[in-house]
């Protein structure tokens, strides 16, 4: 979901 995308991007930082 959208939240999964956000958390995924933050995890890449």
Swiss-Prot record:
The keyword Lyase does not apply. Keywords: Amidation, Amphibian defense peptide, Secreted. It is found in: Secreted. It comes from Litoria ewingii. The modification Leucine amide is found at residue 13. One of its GO terms (cellular component) is extracellular region. GO terms for biological process: defense response. This is Caeridin-7.1. Caeridins show neither neuropeptide activity nor antibiotic activity. Expressed by the skin dorsal glands.
